[in-house]
């Protein structure tokens, strides 16, 4: 039998490699009962949208109920820095897994798909988001957020920022605090009395 672990084509994750344990993206695949496995990565190995495919086949031995195949993406035990998954946030990043248990090439999805949550890293930059155009007397909002190295809103901010504008803004506080667990703060009801 064999299996496929598939990823969506609309992703910027790196591709696994199996040759050099010191390089990025080093991936290991092992059977719990020491069955011999053959594997490779094929960016077009399955039907879209799940076309980026890691293919694993049992070529010597077999698996019984309870035996497992363990795949470690970005194995760091021998010096690899790991593997970069996609750089954008997702609550359920799926390792879409299909199995062909009796070697008929009729792949079936697992009833429960393995998934992880892709979260933002620590902030490396802070961004203020405002409307492009507003007239004097028209209300607007200001949103302030920390962004990680990939531009994702980070919920790991923990600081107080001083706010200063080049003209008088009604309702603008002197400071704003970004706390852990919150990815942005919005200040509503702001207004300028004159054009600037």
Residue spans for each PLM region:
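Ser/Thr/Pro/Gly-rich, low-complexity intrinsically disordered stalk/linker tracts of secreted
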Residues: 1-141, 149-151
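Exposed aromatic-hydrophobic patches
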Residues: 70-72, 184-190
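Low-complexity "stalk/linker" and mucin-like segments enriched in Ser/Thr/Pro/Ala/Gly
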Residues: 34-40, 44-46, 164-185
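Surface-exposed loops/turns
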Residues: 65, 136, 155-156, 180, ...
């Amino acid at each position: 039998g064999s299996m496929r672990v598939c990823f969506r084509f609309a992703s910027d994750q790196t591709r696994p490699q199996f040759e050099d344990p010191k390089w990025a993206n080093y991936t290991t695949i092992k059977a719990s009962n020491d069955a011999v496995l053959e594997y490779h990565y094929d960016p077009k190995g399955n039907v879209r949208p799940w076309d980026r495919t890691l293919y694993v086949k049992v070529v010597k031995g077999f698996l019984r109920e309870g035996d497992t195949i363990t795949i470690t993406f970005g194995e760091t035990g021998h010096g690899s820095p790991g593997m970069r998954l996609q750089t954008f946030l997702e609550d359920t990043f799926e390792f879409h897994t299909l199995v062909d248990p009796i070697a008929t090439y009729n792949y079936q999805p697992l009833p429960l798909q393995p998934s992880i949550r892709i979260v933002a890293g620590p902030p490396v930059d802070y961004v203020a988001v405002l409307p492009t155009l507003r007239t004097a007397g028209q209300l607007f909002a200001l949103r302030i957020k920390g962004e990680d190295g990939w531009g994702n809103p980070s919920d790991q901010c923990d600081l107080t920022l001083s706010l200063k504008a080049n003209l008088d803004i009604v309702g603008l506080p002197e400071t704003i605090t970004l706390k852990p667990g919150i990815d942005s703060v919005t200040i509503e009801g702001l207004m300028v009395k004159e054009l600037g």
